[in-house]
Design a protein with these regions (language model features):
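N-terminal Rossmann-like NAD(P)+-binding domain of SDR-like oxidoreductases, especially those catalyzing
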Residues: 1-189
Length: 189
């Protein structure tokens, strides 16, 4: 079976590197980049791969369950790498509702779409994977310096992290979480 992978947040800083890596390293995979193109998304990051035959960009909101579910059916998705998130600290203070909507409800939308679609297949979850890329902030601050725990901007990421763990335990054979710490590159300098 040919692999077909949705990468959410694929026009963002980390996501664009992941999309490029998969498009170039796995020419037999179908890579579907789903991004809402908010302040953090920039398709110019992917100009060099936009015409690759195994690449597709879909402008969509991960909170739009119907669109995500239909896309999974259309593309026969076998895996998800979920990077889409609100992460800008100043924005989280000004507009916590947007953070909660994207980070919690968007993650739930992705998890539920994957669950329902993969359950509908004869092979169910076999060979399917859901990777959730979060943040090291879900662990909170080290107690010796900051006993107050997780700072408000990161509570939504902690919630999405917990939803992923719960779905992984109850529904999926293969789930992986990754919580990077201070990603950096020359383009971010």
């Amino acid at each position: 079976m040919k692999k077909s992978i949705i990468i959410t947040g694929g026009a963002g800083f980390i996501g664009s590197h992941v999309v490029r890596l998969f498009v170039n390293k796995y020419p037999d995979y179908r890579i579907i980049n789903v991004d809402k193109l908010t302040y953090a998304g920039n398709l110019a990051n992917l100009k060099d791969i936009e015409d690759q035959p195994n690449y597709r960009f879909v402008k969509a909101d991960i909170c739009d369950f119907d669109t995500i579910y239909a896309l999974m059916q259309e593309e026969k998705v076998t895996g998800i790498i979920h990077l889409a998130a609100e992460s800008h600290v100043d924005r989280s203070i000004k507009d916590p509702f947007t953070f909660a909507r994207t980070n919690v409800m968007g993650t739930l939308s992705m998890l539920q779409a994957a669950k329902l679609y993969w359950e509908s297949l004869p092979e169910k979850y076999e060979g399917k994977r859901f990777y959730h890329i979060s943040t090291d902030e879900v662990y909170g601050a080290l107690e010796m310096n900051h006993p107050e725990g997780i700072e408000p901007p990161f509570t939504t990421k902690a919630s999405s992290h917990e939803h992923h763990l719960a779905y992984g335990d109850d529904f999926f054979y293969e789930t992986t979480k990754y919580n990077p710490h201070s990603p950096y590159s020359a383009s971010k300098a």
